[in-house]
């Protein structure tokens, strides 16, 4: 029998089924860098508008992990999406270069080398070199993810001009009266020997002693109450702070019960405390808290007086309703102390050990000197003697240092703060506090997800003053001079601008290298002996929080618009970068420095647990890239609901790889089947069939849905819409139905050419929607299709832009076939019956069938195409009957070329195929 395979249009494409991504992507990315692809993107002439994404800086320390990849890939998708829409994009990647983690790395290295480095300038030089090294490492690792940006000129917070910009932002804060030096309790990391800001604290579970202690009322207080004995019972989980107790706070207007044995507790808590055995069960007297105010009790640890006060912070849900108050070790205690003029006792050093203050003020005996507060707690509890009513151990959420992961303490020290509740002058001449301005600014910002707005609002509503000062070396200094004659900082513009100019020319190292005289402007040098330098450095959150100023407003000039259109970071940045940027923006410009905040979740393992080396559940980014390639990693990011935590395992990446293969194989099929088109056919009108109109209308609906989802940055929704179209309507219906025409019709057949135009339109939309995500793959698609490039008028992926399918195909509208849903329903029922007949061995495939349809209104040619049968009508040999249709054996012979049963003679081509063969 004659072979007809060579007469079919079995077109091929050089676009490979296998991407071999891990080998090919690095070559593509190197080419993009060499050709300065990002600059080309910025210089495209058909820009419709501007779009700025301001990069929250990663820390220049260590290699990238999957969390970095998630963040940078999402940003890259957002940026490229805006670019392909036709906007001019601004994106300058940056790095946070100062701070404690780098200091710790250098200190550990020096310790291993058994050397010390007292010279701060040399120490800072080592820190700078470390940051430079990892900045380059991370930059190259980012580029392997297929991300684009101004990586040739990124921002670095350690650049001299950048340091000057950070300092100038600080100066603005000072000039507006919001920067003050205060002696108050703040989070203190004894492991880092430095103050911490709210954003540098993480909460973890910790076991602590839980003790109930009786403070006996003094004789005069007992006489006022007309009782013989009474002891206020306090509850605390920080016994080490009892040495600094100066007061006990009660709940205003609440009733307090005095038991028969003389213990005073809140009445509503008495029953619970009696059940615990803290107090006896019989109540002898009741007192209103207001009548107890200003009475005095005795601290059983050191016999010092403890004033009874009323506090708004006192709750009646737990404890005793009587709160141990040590203004040197608690913020609420401190503010209560201001109200009652309480003494601030704080005798704990930088390392968290008791210092000589405990001896001078007779707070503890000298045996505690130099002992760490947490280690001392056992002895303190023993020393309480009979005053200890109950001791337990509890596990509770406790603040820890985010860098060392060690517990922190509250410790009153002299630090510099940005004040949240100090009114300052607004642009309209009114006065508002920073808290008020920030809360108002939040209302004008869009949040994705929307829950982020309330989260940030709540944090701003409840946050304390911002502790800015750090007792470290690697950072931007709080470069102010204290006038020793007044003990006040010098905020004169001439002095501050002179320092800023020095930083811009020489960097911040000059603050350590130069004398006071050399740092002052000439007009102040004569009085230099009256000034001394502040030697604290700035909280690194101030560095990163002021990046919008340096990148978008001053130093980097044409790097984007301020406020930026979007910032995009992990959800933990509500308490970090989002807050610091918001607060600095509100001080400098009375507005948020961003219009939209997008947040993503964290990377967790397949069980939803946090990844850690100790658990052995870390998935290596480098291994993923080597095994799957960056486009698969990018697709995994986009195909997940990034607003929640992303679960990751090899299983998830294998699933993503299947999605990738579906897109790739579909594109390969499309490319192959329009590869033989004459480019002249792109410029003329075509007569599209009802089936063509169906898929084009579905493509239009799909495009609208994907566009809408992508506009909301809901990439997983958009991709699911796209994948459903590719799987169901395109592959499941249209391509199957068109294969006969594509393979068997003449190359010049008008129907076939119309189908090819449809395939071009589909490929165009797939490229447009997938380009922000699978940029390398779409670049590869265009490299392998001259026809598609001509249709899109694009030589590579960076020429892509949205197209109007109707205009491109010279159509006024898409005309969906009448009764099409009925044909699809018929197709579904037919396929079900076909499966049964195949299993029973009656037939092998649908082409062996003829079908008589009961619903006569259905178009025969559409039924034949969609059901892929050889004949519509009645035939002799019935094989099945259903309420909707009757199936027969096809009444003709199988065509050896197209395999449809349409030949009048055995082993002879059908009429259609004969005509095609004559043309060859």
From Swiss-Prot:
Names of required cofactors: Zn(2+)
Predominant cellular place of this UniProt entry's protein: cytoplasm
Catalytic activity annotation: tRNA(Ile) + L-isoleucine + ATP = L-isoleucyl-tRNA(Ile) + AMP + diphosphate
Pfam family, one: tRNA-synt_1
Chain's role: Catalyzes the attachment of isoleucine to tRNA(Ile). As IleRS can inadvertently accommodate and process structurally similar amino acids such as valine, to avoid such errors it has two additional distinct tRNA(Ile)-dependent editing activities. One activity is designated as 'pretransfer' editing and involves the hydrolysis of activated Val-AMP. The other activity is designated 'posttransfer' editing and involves deacylation of mischarged Val-tRNA(Ile).
Family named by the database record: Belongs to the class-I aminoacyl-tRNA synthetase family. IleS type 1 subfamily.
Protein name per its UniProtKB record: Isoleucine--tRNA ligase
Organism, as annotated: Helicobacter pylori (strain G27)
């Amino acid at each position: 029998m004659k072979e007809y395979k060579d007469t079919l249009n079995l077109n091929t494409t050089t676009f490979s089924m296998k991407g071999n991504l891990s080998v090919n992507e690095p070559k593509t990315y190197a080419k993009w860098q060499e050709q300065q692809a990002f600059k080309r993107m910025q210089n495209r002439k058909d820009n419709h508008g501007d779009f700025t994404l301001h990069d929250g800086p990663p820390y220049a320390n260590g290699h990238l992990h999957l969390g970095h990849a998630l963040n940078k890939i999402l940003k890259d998708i957002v940026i490229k999406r805006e670019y392909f829409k036709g906007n001019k994009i601004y994106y300058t990647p940056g790095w946070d270069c100062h701070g404690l983690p780098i200091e710790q790395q250098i200190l550990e290295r020096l310790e291993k080398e058994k050397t010390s480095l007292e010279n701060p300038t040399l120490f800072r030089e080592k820190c700078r070199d470390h940051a430079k090294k990892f900045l380059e490492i991370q930059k190259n690792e980012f580029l392997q993810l297929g991300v684009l940006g101004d990586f040739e000129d990124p921002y670095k917070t350690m650049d001299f001009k950048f340091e000057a910009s950070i300092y100038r932002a600080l100066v603005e804060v000072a000039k507006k009266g919001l920067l003050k030096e205060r002696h108050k309790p703040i989070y203190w990391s004894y492991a880092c020997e430095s103050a911490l800001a709210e954003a540098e604290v993480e909460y973890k579970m910790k076991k602590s002693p839980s003790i109930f202690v009786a403070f006996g009322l003094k004789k005069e207080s007992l006489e006022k109450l007309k009782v013989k004995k009474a002891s206020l019972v306090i509850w605390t989980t920080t016994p080490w702070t009892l040495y600094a107790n100066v007061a006990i706070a009660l709940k205003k207007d609440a009733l307090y019960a005095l038991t028969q044995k003389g213990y005073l507790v809140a009445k509503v808590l008495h029953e619970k405390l009696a059940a615990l055995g803290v107090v006896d069960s019989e109540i002898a007297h009741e007192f209103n808290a207001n009548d107890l105010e200003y009475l005095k009790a005795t601290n059983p640890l050191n016999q010092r007086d403890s004033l009874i006060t009323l506090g708004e912070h006192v709750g009646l849900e737990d404890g005793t309703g009587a709160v141990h108050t040590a203004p040197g070790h608690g913020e609420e205690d401190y503010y209560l102390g201001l109200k009652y003029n309480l003494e601030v006792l704080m005798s704990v050093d930088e390392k968290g050990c008791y210092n000589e203050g405990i001896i001078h003020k007779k707070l503890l005996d000298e045996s505690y000197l130099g002992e760490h507060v947490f280690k001392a707690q056992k002895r303190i509890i023993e020393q309480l003697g009979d005053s200890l009513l109950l001791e337990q151990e509890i596990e509770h959420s406790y603040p820890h240092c985010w860098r060392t992961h060690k517990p922190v303490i509250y410790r009153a020290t002299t630090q510099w703060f940005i004040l949240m509740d100090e009114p300052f002058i607004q642009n309209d001449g009114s006065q508002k506090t920073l808290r008020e301005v920030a809360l108002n600014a939040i209302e004008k910002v869009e949040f994705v997800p929307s829950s982020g707005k309330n989260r940030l609002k709540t944090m701003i509503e409840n946050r304390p003053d911002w502790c800015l000062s750090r007792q470290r070396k690697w950072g931007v200094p709080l470069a102010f001079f204290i006038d020793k004659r007044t003990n006040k900082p010098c905020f004169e513009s001439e002095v501050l601008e002179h320092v800023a100019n020095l930083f811009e020319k020489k960097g911040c190292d000059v603050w350590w290298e130069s004398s006071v005289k050399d740092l002052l402007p000439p007009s102040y040098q004569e009085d230099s002996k009256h000034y001394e330098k502040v030697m604290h450095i700035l909280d690194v959150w101030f560095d990163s929080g002021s990046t919008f100023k340096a990148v978008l407003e001053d130093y980097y000039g044409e790097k984007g618009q301020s406020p930026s259109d979007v910032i995009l970071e992990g959800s933990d940045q509500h308490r970090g970068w989002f807050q610091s940027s918001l607060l600095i923006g509100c001080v400098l410009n009375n507005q948020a420095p961003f219009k939209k905040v997008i947040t993503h979740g964290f990377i967790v393992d397949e069980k939803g647990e946090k990844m850690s080396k100790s658990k052995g559940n870390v998935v290596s980014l480098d291994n993923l890239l080597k095994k799957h390639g960056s486009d698969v990693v990018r697709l995994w990011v986009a195909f997940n609901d990034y607003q929640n935590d992303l679960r990751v395992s090899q299983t998830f990446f294998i699933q993503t790889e299947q999605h990738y293969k579906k897109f790739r194989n579909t594109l390969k099929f499309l490319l192959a089947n329009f590869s033989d088109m004459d480019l002249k056919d792109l410029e003329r009108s075509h007569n599209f069939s009802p089936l063509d109109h169906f898929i084009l209308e579905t493509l239009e609906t799909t495009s609208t849905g994907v566009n809408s989802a992508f506009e909301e940055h809901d990439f997983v929704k958009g991709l699911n819409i796209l994948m459903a179209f590719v799987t169901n309507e395109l592959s499941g219906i249209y391509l199957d139905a068109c294969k006969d025409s594509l393979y068997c019709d003449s190359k010049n057949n008008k129907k076939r050419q119309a189908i090819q135009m449809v395939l071009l339109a589909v490929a165009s939309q797939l490229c447009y929607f997938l380009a922000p995500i699978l940029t390398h793959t779409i670049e590869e698609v265009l490299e392998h299709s001259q026809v598609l490039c001509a249709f899109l008028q694009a030589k590579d992926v960076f020429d892509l832009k949205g197209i109007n399918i109707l205009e491109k195909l010279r159509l006024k509208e898409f005309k969906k076939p009448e009764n099409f849903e009925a044909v699809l329903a018929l197709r579904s029922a037919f396929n079900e019956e076909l499966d049964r007949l195949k299993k029973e061995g009656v037939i092998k495939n649908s082409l062996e069938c003829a079908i008589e349809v009961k619903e006569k209104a259905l178009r025969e040619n559409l039924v034949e195409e969609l059901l892929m049968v050889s004949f519509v009508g009645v035939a002799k040999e019935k094989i099945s009957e259903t309420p909707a249709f009757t199936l027969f054996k096809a009444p003709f012979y199988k065509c050896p070329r197209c395999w449809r049963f349409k030949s009048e003679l055995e082993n002879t081509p059908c009429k259609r195929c004969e005509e095609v063969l004559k043309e060859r």
